C-alpha cells in the first residue's frame, strides 16, 4: 500500500522513470493534446522551459510551436528521463531545437530570460514550492507566461489553491488556465497585462 500511495496519492515523490510509460503513450494525445493545450500561450521564436520534462511529451510540442528560431530547454532531475526524451526528439528531427538538461531538486539553473515556462504535473513533487516559484519569477520575462498544471488525483483542490496562493506571494498575477483533462491549471504572469498580450 505504501508504494501505491506514493505513486497514486498525495505523498511527495519524484515520478520514477519507468512509470512514464503508463501515461505517456499515443492514447494520451486524445485527451491531452499538447499543441492544443499550449497553442495561444507560446509564440514562434520564443525561448521556453519545460520543467520536469520527463520523457519529453510537451518538450517536443513546444519545439514545434517555437519553430527553428525558438529554443526549448527541457529540465529534469532524472538522467534516464532525459535519455528517453533525447531519443524521442532525435526520432522526430527536433533534437537541434531542444536542449535537455539535468537540474537539481532545489535549483533549475536557468540564467537567461525566458518567455514561457511549463510545469505540468510536477509542482506537487517539489519540496519547497515557494522557493521553486520564486526562482521561476527570476528568469521569466515581464511579458512572459508560466503555465502551471497539476493532476486532480495527486493534488486535491485545497492543495492546488495553496500553490496558487504561493504563486501570488511570489509576485505572479494568476488567471484560469486552459482546460486540461483530469487536471487543474492556471496561467501566471509577471504583470497583469501579460496574458492579454499573447495571441
Q: What feature does the model see in each segment?
A:
Residues 13-30:
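Class I SAM-dependent methyltransferase Rossmann-like catalytic core
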Residues 28-46:
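Conserved alpha-helix/loop element of class I SAM-dependent methyltransferases that forms part
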Residues 49, 55-107:
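Class I SAM-dependent methyltransferase SAM/SAH-binding core
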Residues 103-117:
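A short acidic, Gly/Pro-enriched loop at the edge of an enzyme's catalytic core
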Residues 115-127:
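A short SAM/SAH-binding and catalytic strip from SAM-dependent methyltransferases
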Residues 130-142:
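A short glycine-rich, Lys/Arg-flanked "PGG" loop and its adjoining helix->strand segment in the class I
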Residues 143-150:
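Conserved beta-strand signature within the Rossmann-like core of class I S-adenosyl-L-methionine
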Residues 170, 179-199:
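Core SAM-dependent methyltransferase catalytic element
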Amino acid at each position: 500500500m505504501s508504494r501505491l500511495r506514493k505513486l497514486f496519492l498525495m505523498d511527495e515523490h519524484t515520478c520514477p522513470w519507468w512509470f512514464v510509460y503508463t501515461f505517456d503513450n499515443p492514447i494520451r494525445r486524445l485527451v491531452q493534446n499538447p499543441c492544443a493545450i499550449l497553442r495561444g500561450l507560446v509564440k514562434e521564436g520564443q525561448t521556453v522551459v519545460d520543467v520536469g520534462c520527463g520523457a519529453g511529451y510537451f518538450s517536443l510540442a513546444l519545439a514545434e510551436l517555437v519553430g527553428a528560431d525558438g529554443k526549448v530547454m527541457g529540465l529534469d532531475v532524472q538522467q534516464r528521463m532525459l535519455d528517453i526524451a533525447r531519443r524521442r526528439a532525435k526520432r522526430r528531427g527536433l533534437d537541434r531545437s531542444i536542449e535537455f538538461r539535468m537540474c537539481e531538486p532545489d535549483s533549475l539553473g536557468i540564467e537567461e530570460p525566458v518567455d514561457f515556462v511549463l510545469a505540468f504535473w510536477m509542482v506537487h513533487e517539489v519540496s519547497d514550492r515557494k522557493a521553486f516559484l520564486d526562482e521561476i519569477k527570476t528568469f521569466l520575462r515581464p511579458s512572459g507566461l508560466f503555465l502551471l498544471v497539476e493532476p486532480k488525483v495527486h493534488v486535491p483542490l485545497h492543495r492546488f489553491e495553496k500553490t496558487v496562493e504561493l504563486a501570488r506571494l511570489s509576485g505572479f498575477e494568476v488567471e484560469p488556465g486552459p482546460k486540461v483533462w483530469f487536471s487543474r491549471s492556471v496561467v501566471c504572469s509577471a504583470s497583469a497585462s501579460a496574458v492579454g498580450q499573447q495571441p
